[in-house]
Amino acid sequence: MVTGPRFSMPATKSQFIPQKSIQVFLDGFCFYTPQHWEFIPFKNLPTDTQGFLEETFKKYFGNQPPSIIHFEHPALFVPQALFENSKKEDYYTHYNTLAEAFELNVLDTEDKTLKVVAPIASKWKSFFKKMHANIDIINYQNLLYNLVQSHSKTQTSKQLFVHLQNGAFDLFLFDGANLLFNNRFAQNNVDTFLYFLFYVVETLKLDQDAFDLYFLGKYDSYNAYYDGVSNFHNNLQYLFVDDQKNTTPAPAPFFCSH
């Protein structure tokens, strides 16, 4: 049982998470600025999809291009020294199925130690590039890695970071600046989340007194998740606690708050 949550804040969140973005999920878009966010399901898009999205784009961002952040499928992290671009599909398909109509985008982590092989929907890549040639196309896990690595490299104990989103959660385990483990797991309730979380902890033989567990952000919609972990782990902390309240949680709330 934690005696009380500790809150920590490395640098500033806006150094790592864009303040204006279009977040692409399997079932829709989330348009985000610090003042407002709106989730638009694909099933609600009108017949004139292009015209509607261009109008929504201008309403939120004017002539300033946002970042396009892809959440549809998990990315694969490959050590820079071992990476060969011609083998990116082989790397990825050994990790996860490459869905039809998706292509692989290769990015660098900020510390230049890893290549991030990330699937993006070809349709939306082409669409947004037509809207603005210089638009940034990013995978959300690359952004998360950069943020949590910047924090963990200053710590002496192992750090396990948890990012919660609709239908899934991400884990990153660091020892100092070095990534030891990462993965994304499906979840739709607290029990499933706790099962996978503690399966990983046991598989990696992590002594609870030897690592700190961080949630990214702290949101009312996930209180049951925090409570569930606090019953089993003593070093529970939160990074970038957001004071904004919203009765309807965003699909990935950590990316919709600054």
What name fits each language-model region?
Residues 1-258:
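Hydrophobic/aromatic-enriched cytosolic interaction surfaces used to assemble or bind macromolecules
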